[in-house]
């Protein structure tokens, strides 16, 4: 992928941080979105800038559509263009059929599905007829279903469908792909 003007949601930690590091370079601009990981975002910014990358940070709560709608215009203004959107941010909280609730279910859908949908919509508007890439980070759970992490799994399955339908709609200029990583090291909120 030869992207030079990249947006990465949830780019400050874990997979997002690894993606940013792998795409960094002298002629690359990256907008790193974060919500609660300001310190990690600032540290990553310094690391990437040492590699010659121009880095811009934006804080946004992806469960708030008004904040979501500020990300693409901010990125376009800072980078003077766009050619790649990586929808990496996600909410991953344990629940199941017996104990899920409206608040958690809605928040999973807002962050893991609704935010990427609005970001894709805005990205397409700014890219117009240029060639570009959209990458949605899905999850291997979508292909290997279990009854655990109920709200998360349903939201990621919907993101997989969003990926397929937007790929059909935006082809051939904008290529849309999904990546479904397997297990990663646990985060501080997860148990063994």
Question: Which role does the model predict for each range below?
Answer:
Residues 96-97, 101-109:
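Substrate-binding pocket helix/loop in short-chain dehydrogenase/reductase
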Residues 133-171, 183-186:
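Catalytic loop of short-chain dehydrogenase/reductase
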Residues 4, 53-54, 81-82, 126-140, ...:
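Active-site loop of short-chain dehydrogenase/reductase
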Residues 38, 59-70, 102:
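The beta1-alpha1 cofactor-binding region of Rossmann-like NAD(H)/NADP(H)-dependent oxidoreductases
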Residues 12-14:
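Conserved glycine-rich cofactor-binding loop
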Residues 88-93:
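Conserved NAD(P)H cofactor-binding loop of Rossmann-fold oxidoreductase domains
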Residues 26-43:
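Conserved glycine-rich Rossmann-like NAD(P)H-binding loop of the short-chain dehydrogenase/reductase
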């Amino acid at each position: 992928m030869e992207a030079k003007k990249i947006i990465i949601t949830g780019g400050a930690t874990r997979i997002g941080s690894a993606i940013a590091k792998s795409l960094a370079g002298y002629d690359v601009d990256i907008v790193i979105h974060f919500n609660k990981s300001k310190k990690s975002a600032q540290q990553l910014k310094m690391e990437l800038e040492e590699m010659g990358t121009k880095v811009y940070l934006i804080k946004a709560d992806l469960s708030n559509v008004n904040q979501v709608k500020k990300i693409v215009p901010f990125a376009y203004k800072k980078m003077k263009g766009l050619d790649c959107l990586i929808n990496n941010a996600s909410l991953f909280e344990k629940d199941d059929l017996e104990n899920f609730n409206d608040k958690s279910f809605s928040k999973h859908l807002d962050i893991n599905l609704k935010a990427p949908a609005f970001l894709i919509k805005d990205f397409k508007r700014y890219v117009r007829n240029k060639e570009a890439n959209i990458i949605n980070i899905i999850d291997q759970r979508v292909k290997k279903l279990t009854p655990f992490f109920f709200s998360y799994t349903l939201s990621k399955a919907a993101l997989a469908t969003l990926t397929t339908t937007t790929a059909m709609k935006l082809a051939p200029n904008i290529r849309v792909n999904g990546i479904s990583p397997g297990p990663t090291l646990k985060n501080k909120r997860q148990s063994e």
